[in-house]
Amino acid sequence: MLTITFGTAGVRAALRLLEATLDPTPLNEQTTTINRTASGVEWLDPVFQIISSGALFAWGGLALFLLLRHLPAPMDWRLRAKDWLHGAGLAAIIGLPGLAFYFSAVHLGLSRNVAPSGLADNPAQLPLLVLNSWANGFAEELVVVAWLATRLRQLRWGWPAVFAASSLLRGSYHLYQGYSAGVGNIVMGIIYLWYFKKTGRIWPLVIGHGLIDTVAFVGYAVWF
């Protein structure tokens, strides 16, 4: 599962960070773009963007399928109204301090400048950014939290080891942004897994992640 999803992404991101570190240009003078233009042909670019988002939804869907098939006890998968409230709270807890941490890290030379969107300045691209935001949230939380934690517990891993594995995996595939992105996402991983362990609810995590990315991606596209 991890080989075809975020495990490989983590290795690739670590190598990207190594490449950026070896570059003579200081890390905080480099820029990395999250949502890049995928084609120079205007009408083809949205097609590529939708395919990329679809792949992420497929990753999350595979994790969901495996959970439904192999869970020893059924999990409550219903989406409740309070999930949106909890998700918004998680987004605020992670997003606001995370933004301050990012700017501090850039100032200290521990992060590249991150451009959340490199798509064309076109209002028609905004729905694609929203789609990708929620695709990220769905894939990451289903795979890195729900599936991975459940599978490791089935393999009799203790909770400290599960926390380490899940949070380090989340940090690894964000390393292409800089060292601070790895650390910040490890912290996010610990908080998100703690919530999942405490409540058994995954949708607030998906919602929180989707809201964070939507604000970052769409906000950047609108203001910059």
Functional labels for PLM-detected ranges:
Residues 64-74, 195-198:
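Structural signal for the C-terminal ends of transmembrane alpha-helices
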Residues 5, 9-12, 16, 133-134, ...:
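Generic alpha-helical structural signal
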Residues 3, 56-59, 83-87, 91, ...:
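Small-residue packing motifs within transmembrane alpha-helices
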Residues 19-50, 68-136, 150, 154-155:
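Juxtamembrane helix-loop-helix connectors linking adjacent transmembrane helices
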Residues 2-12, 53-67, 91-104:
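Hydrophobic core of alpha-helical transmembrane segments in multi-pass integral membrane proteins
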Residues 8-20, 145-146, 150:
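Short helix-terminus and kink motifs of transmembrane alpha helices
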Residues 99, 103-224:
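Transmembrane helix-loop-helix hairpins at the membrane interface
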